[in-house]
UniProtKB/Swiss-Prot annotation:
This is Porphobilinogen deaminase. GO terms for molecular function: hydroxymethylbilane synthase activity. NCBIfam families: hemC. PROSITE patterns: PORPHOBILINOGEN_DEAM. Its EC number is 2.5.1.61. Keywords: Porphyrin biosynthesis, Transferase. Monomer. Residues 307-331 are annotated as: Disordered. Binds 1 dipyrromethane group covalently.
Amino acid sequence: MTTAAALSVLRLGTRRSTLARAQTEEIAGALRAAGCRVEIVGIQSTGDRHADVPLHEFAGSGVFVAELRAALLRGEVDVVVHSMKDLPTAEIPELAIAAIPRRADPRDALVTGAGCRLAELPTGAIVGTGSPRRAAQLRLLRPDLEIRPIRGNLDTRLGKLHAGGYAALIVAAAGLARLHRSEEAAEFFDPTVMLPAPGQGALAVECRRADIADGGRLAGILAGLDDPATRAAVTAERALLAAVGAGCSAPVGALGVVTADTLQLDAVVVDPSGTTAFRRSLTGTPDDASDLGRRLAADLIRAGADQLLQAPKQTGEPHDPDRHDKGTGRP
């Protein structure tokens, strides 16, 4: 096993957005504390390069991760850091998620120009989100609001809000926190009100599988970043997403919570129009996270959620940036 001191420089690949760099700095700081020398390498993703193109117009999946994975496979970087919610559920055999650090706040947050809460927004107020999951759950709560798509990184979206184009935005609480802008949130949605995207708030530290195999150069170094409770929760969420049909742009929310030796998984599938929702919960153990996710997916499908999963193909809804397709995001 290679020690941190024996490594020359560990190259961390990241998207170039401010939020992505902040996420990568979290990992870099932990590695430096463990004695590693770290170099951060910025890589432009397809999704960032074409920020004016609606996400549903991109072919395939992994628009925010494919270039990072390509650089990893070519040996140009040693590790890449992803937002877990951007990572497709299908694996690339040569790559492995070496660590899932402790999760940040998984909730969705409402940011409003006037600082008012959701219940205080006037009828017809324009709310921006590029996520069918958020849009559908918002329609359940406030069908009188006007929901419009919005693209761009978090800084860009917040700028559009403050320029007056929207009355409110729904964004990830973790993104606000990592940019030190949590004070701009008017409201944080309890998961009983709005379930987040699978993996929301979590980071994925990915490397070449051979590098963490027995005797691999990174074996042991990246493992120290892993949080078992977060890994179990995210594993259950992603297993559910894959089992219900992750290739669809359907509004699916899921959140796992580990308490002692218990893992509770809550999930929802919502009609894009916000008229119908199927919500179910199951409890199991962290060791059976994948099976728990698959069993809850089966419960949802038996309840009729599979009909909603087919609906987005005819709705014209934009692809959800919080969702992952069955594709690997492989270049």
